[in-house]
């Protein structure tokens, strides 16, 4: 067996799967709000020899020899993350956002403590207390949500819930909330009831880095995020805080040896590259285009009779309630897949359907904006979506919709 043989020879089945996925990404419009297109530089770092190196511990304090060069990569990732977000502390080792959240819970709380998070059915996340997740099994959760009439967080009601339940931690952030979140107000609520504030900014980290959304770092005790999504890095997690002296050691110990063993040094190097890219002038303009594209897409959908939760968007994400179109989220996801538009079915607040069917879809603009699509293209995408739903039973017309998607993809090649 030779270590130098190419993948196509060693494992043609996996090579074929990668080729097929590459073609899928090239030939479809990616509207899943949590997905993006990593740069060649990020992928080069992630596919480097750093994948060979075990490095349990932290820079300068490893349990293995030969870590002097991976220490350089991790130190760069830490310093860049701190600079990018104005933080006093950063841990770049979490393998995912879920593990970042879990580490924070175990760093600051004891099993059985009460946490208040956003209801999954209203746009929260599994790791914010779902009973099927470790968070909901080890801690007692109470939930806040959105108003039925507005689709927005009611901060006064949020305070009432916090005052009643006296949580030890409040978790802010969401996976399907299209509006700006006021972290200052939530910090006031947390302070009033004596709770820690943890902000999960996984979806909006890129917008925060670009100054297009209020940063939670000055207000939260701890901030977690993924490093992909709007940040456009590798799939991974990150923990930040302002007060390194108060929280740094606790967080480091909770990550390693608490919930993880060896860090993924190739992924950490890719994170460092992504943080550097996010500090370049063009990144802020890219984030502006994400938001302007999302608003253009939202407006175009509204004009075509789609109902949007909260009536629009302030960020990269749109939550579409499809009940007025007489189609479920699952049916729409399958329909749009057929014409080359990738979305995910998603529950809407107060959804009568079960999650595996759902009444809505969640869409977003990070990936299509990375490809270069503009506001005019968003109008065309809305037209395609509306046309596909209207003619969902007409194969010939669905083929026409697919052809329009092919035209757009040809104008904006992937890589």
Curated annotation (Swiss-Prot):
SUPFAM superfamilies: PLP-dependent transferases
Pfam families: SHMT
Principal location listed in the UniProt entry: cytoplasm
Enzyme class: transferase
UniProt keyword annotation of Cytoplasm present: yes
Pathway: One-carbon metabolism; tetrahydrofolate interconversion; Amino-acid biosynthesis; glycine biosynthesis; glycine from L-serine: step 1/1
Cell compartment(s), UniProt: Cytoplasm
GO molecular function, one term: pyridoxal phosphate binding
InterPro entries: PyrdxlP-dep_Trfase, PyrdxlP-dep_Trfase_major, PyrdxlP-dep_Trfase_small, Ser_HO-MeTrfase, Ser_HO-MeTrfase-like, Ser_HO-MeTrfase_PLP_BS, SHMT-like_dom
Entry GO CC: cytosol
Alphabetized UniProt keyword annotations: Amino-acid biosynthesis, Cytoplasm, One-carbon metabolism, Pyridoxal phosphate, Transferase
Cofactor field: pyridoxal 5'-phosphate
Modification sites for N6-(pyridoxal phosphate)lysine: 229
GO biological process: glycine biosynthetic process from serine; tetrahydrofolate interconversion
Binding site for (6S)-5,6,7,8-tetrahydrofolate: 120, 124-126
Record carries keyword Cell wall biogenesis/degradation: no
Catalyzed reactions: (6R)-5,10-methylene-5,6,7,8-tetrahydrofolate + glycine + H2O = (6S)-5,6,7,8-tetrahydrofolate + L-serine
Site (Plays an important role in substrate specificity): 228
PANTHER family in alphabetical order: SERINE HYDROXYMETHYLTRANSFERASE, SERINE HYDROXYMETHYLTRANSFERASE 1
Family assignment from sequence similarity: Belongs to the SHMT family.
Subunit structure: Homodimer.
Function: Catalyzes the reversible interconversion of serine and glycine with tetrahydrofolate (THF) serving as the one-carbon carrier. This reaction serves as the major source of one-carbon groups required for the biosynthesis of purines, thymidylate, methionine, and other important biomolecules. Also exhibits THF-independent aldolase activity toward beta-hydroxyamino acids, producing glycine and aldehydes, via a retro-aldol mechanism.
The protein, known as: Serine hydroxymethyltransferase
Source organism per UniProt: Pelotomaculum thermopropionicum (strain DSM 13744 / JCM 10971 / SI)
Lineage: Bacteria, Bacillati, Bacillota, Clostridia, Eubacteriales
Gene name for this UniProt entry: glyA
């Amino acid at each position: 067996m030779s270590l130098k043989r190419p993948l196509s020879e060693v494992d043609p089945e996996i090579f074929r799967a990668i080729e097929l996925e590459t073609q899928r990404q090239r030939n479809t419009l990616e509207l899943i709000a949590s997905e993006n297109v990593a740069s060649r530089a990020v992928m080069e770092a992630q596919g480097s020899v750093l994948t060979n190196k075990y490095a349990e511990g932290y820079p300068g304090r490893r349990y293995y020899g030969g870590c002097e060069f991976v220490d350089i990569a991790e130190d760069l990732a830490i310093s860049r993350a701190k600079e990018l977000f104005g933080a006093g502390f950063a841990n770049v080792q979490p393998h995912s956002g879920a593990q970042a959240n879990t580490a924070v819970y175990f760093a600051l709380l004891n099993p059985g403590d009460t946490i208040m998070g956003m209801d999954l059915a209203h746009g929260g996340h599994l790791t914010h207390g779902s009973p099927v997740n470790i968070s909901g099994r080890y801690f007692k959760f109470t939930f806040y949500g959105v108003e039925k009439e507005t689709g927005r967080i009611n901060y006064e009601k949020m305070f009432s819930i916090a005052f009643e339940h006296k949580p030890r931690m409040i978790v802010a952030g969401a996976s399907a909330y299209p509006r700006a979140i006021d972290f200052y107000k939530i910090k006031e609520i947390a302070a009033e009831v004596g709770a820690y504030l943890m902000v999960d900014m996984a979806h909006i980290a890129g917008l925060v880095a670009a100054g297009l959304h209020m940063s939670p770092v000055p207000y939260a005790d701890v901030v977690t995020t993924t490093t992909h999504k709007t940040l456009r890095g590798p799939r991974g997690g990150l923990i930040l805080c302002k007060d390194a002296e108060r929280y740094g050691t606790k967080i480091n110990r909770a990550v390693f040896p608490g919930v993880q063993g060896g860090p993924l040094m190739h992924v950490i190097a890719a994170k460092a590259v992504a943080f550097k890219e996010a500090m370049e002038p063009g990144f802020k303009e890219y984030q502006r285009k994400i938001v302007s594209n999302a608003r253009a897409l939202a407006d175009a959908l509204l004009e075509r009779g789609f109902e949007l939760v909260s009536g629009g968007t302030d960020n990269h994400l749109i939550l579409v309630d499809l009940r007025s179109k007489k189609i479920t989220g699952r049916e729409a996801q399958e329909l749009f897949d057929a014409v080359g538009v990738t979305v995910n079915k998603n529950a809407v607040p107060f959804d009568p359907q079960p999650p595996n069917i759902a009444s809505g879809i969640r869409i977003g603009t990070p990936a299509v904006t990375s490809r270069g699509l503009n506001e005019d293209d968003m109008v065309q995408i809305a037209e395609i979506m509306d046309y596909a739903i209207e003619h969902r039973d007409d194969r010939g017309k669905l083929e026409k919709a697919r052809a329009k998607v092919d035209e757009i993809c040809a104008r904006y090649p992937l890589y």
